[in-house]
């Protein structure tokens, strides 16, 4: 449990569990272990190599159990991401709950239907595979 929490609560490891095609780089704020109020700035190129700046704030941390990040500036109108980590028999389970909304009204809803929903899903599937390769798969 401590090993998993140590990895997941270190912002520098986010690049490790993000697909390369996202062009993800941390610009600032990842030089300390996670804490409530921490601001982390990123740049990523998820669509056609177009760079997006993304600023998130870690709003809640309960060491060893969960943390929450919220977008302060970036591609979404709203982004609220809860990461729960719990010890289970013979392992650790991580659960992500993400609520988000795209800008631009109908166009945003259309983009979500057309590709964003599947892109977000594929990113979290990639993370699951990476975490399994790092920590092992729970059977």
Predicted segments with their positions:
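A short, structured loop/turn motif at beta-sheet edges
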Residues: 1, 33, 59-66, 84-93
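Beta-strand/loop substructures that line and gate deep hydrophobic ligand-binding cavities in soluble
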Residues: 71-122
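A cross-taxa feature marking solvent-exposed loop/turn segments within ectodomains of secreted
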Residues: 17, 49-51, 78
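Hydrophobic ligand-binding cavity/cleft-lining segments
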Residues: 1-35
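Amphipathic, soluble alpha-helical interaction motifs
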Residues: 17, 97, 133-137
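Glycine-rich portal/gate segments that line the openings of hydrophobic small-molecule binding cavities
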Residues: 25-73, 126-139
